[in-house]
């Protein structure tokens, strides 16, 4: 992502967080890239709510950060592998790139910007994020357990 934005000096990138390679990334970053380090949740949320897009280049089984961005109404430009395929709805809440290369990221950013000023609906992103909410998870688990218990009780003539 850093390399891609170095090749797009007219575009701004804010990096929040840290990690073992942070100093290396800072040294290679151009003036259009701002490193903010670790931030409290309120600052992270505010930045996500005002971002054009959230770029997610990690290949994770299930990354929560894209869902957090979507819950702020922010579309995701994400790697089209792993959990992003579940957490990002292409064309609805964001778009994908399929290689972890600066060129693929640049292409995705340019495709995103070619869609216009507000290419993804804030409300659609937020609604999609609700699919992954704790409340929905609890409700569906409870329903699943109750259904299986009822089936088992019926099949084994168990009454309470």
Enumerate the predicted regions with their spans.
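Short hydrophobic signal-anchor/transmembrane segments that target glycosyltransferases
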Residues: 1-12, 18-24
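Nucleotide-activated donor-binding/catalytic signature segment of Leloir-type glycosyltransferases, i.e.
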Residues: 22-43
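Conserved acidic donor-binding segment of nucleotide-sugar-dependent glycosyltransferases
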Residues: 37, 90-91, 95-103, 110-117
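Short alpha-helical segment that forms part of, or immediately flanks, the ligand-binding pocket
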Residues: 45, 67-71, 85-86, 92
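Short alpha-helical donor nucleotide-sugar binding micro-motif in glycosyltransferases
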Residues: 46-51, 69, 141
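Acidic donor-binding loop of glycosyltransferase active sites
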Residues: 49-61, 74
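Short hydrophobic beta-strand element within catalytic cores of glycosyltransferases
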Residues: 75-80, 88
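A charged, aromatic-enriched C-terminal amphipathic alpha-helix characteristic of glycosyltransferases
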Residues: 100-103, 117-160
């Amino acid at each position: 992502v850093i390399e891609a934005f170095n090749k797009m000096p007219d575009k701004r990138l804010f990096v929040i967080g840290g990690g073992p390679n942070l100093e290396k990334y800072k040294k290679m970053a151009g003036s259009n890239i701002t490193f903010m380090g670790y931030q409290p949740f309120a600052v992270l949320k505010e930045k996500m709510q005002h971002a054009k897009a959230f770029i997610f280049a990690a290949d994770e089984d299930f990354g929560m950060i894209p869902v957090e961005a979507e819950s702020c109404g922010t579309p995701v430009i994400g790697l089209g592998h792993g959990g992003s395929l579940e957490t990002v709805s292409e064309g609805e809440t964001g778009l994908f790139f399929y290689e972890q290369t600066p060129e693929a990221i640049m292409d995705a950013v340019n495709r995103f910007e070619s869609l216009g000023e507000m290419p993804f609906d804030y409300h659609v992103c937020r609604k999609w994020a609700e699919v992954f909410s704790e409340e929905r998870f609890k409700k569906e688990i409870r329903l699943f357990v109750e259904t299986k218990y009822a089936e088992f009780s019926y099949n084994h003539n168990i009454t309470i």
